Amino acid sequence: MSSEPGRVMALDVGERRIGVALSDPTRMLASPLTTIRAVPRSTALKRILTLIRDYQVTALVVGLPLTMNGDIGPQATLVQQFVDELRPLIDIPIFFVDERLTTVAAERMMIDLKIKPEQRRARIDEVAASIILQDFLDSQR
């Protein structure tokens, strides 16, 4: 990743929802930001573009859900198709990160924090995105 200062955004793209996380300006800490509806696709893309602009994002990290043996399966293909639609609309670097088991880790974290089940369902995607982003930020140090 470039040494250009600024926030990094992460996306956890699913069929129905997209979790969004954002780093602090120093790129040390990732935090859940929001969850947006993945459909209609045009609305989701507009919302992501607005967030990128509003938070002055300088890089994008996208979780790629590889299969357990590291292959690209149907879910990863869905994510790649989404990024193919997003890429021409933005002028910042995009990084794919292996996101196997991040949703499981997010669920466990929220259970440990005693977050109620209905709140967990509402925030699972953005928490997973923050785990993806924090792993990426840590790997860049």
From Swiss-Prot:
SUPFAM superfamilies documented for this protein: Ribonuclease H-like
Subcellular location: Cytoplasm
EC annotation from Swiss-Prot or TrEMBL: 3.1.-.-
Key word Cytoplasm present: yes
A GO BP annotation: rRNA 5'-end processing
GO cellular component: cytosol
Keyword Hydrolase among record annotations: yes
Gene Ontology terms for molecular function: nuclease activity
UniProt xrefs under Pfam families: RuvX
Keyword terms, alphabetized: Cytoplasm, Hydrolase, Nuclease, Ribosome biogenesis
The protein's enzyme class: hydrolase
PANTHER family given in the database record: POLYNUCLEOTIDYL TRANSFERASE, RIBONUCLEASE H-LIKE SUPERFAMILY PROTEIN
Record protein name field: Putative pre-16S rRNA nuclease
Species in which this protein is naturally found: Roseiflexus sp. (strain RS-1)
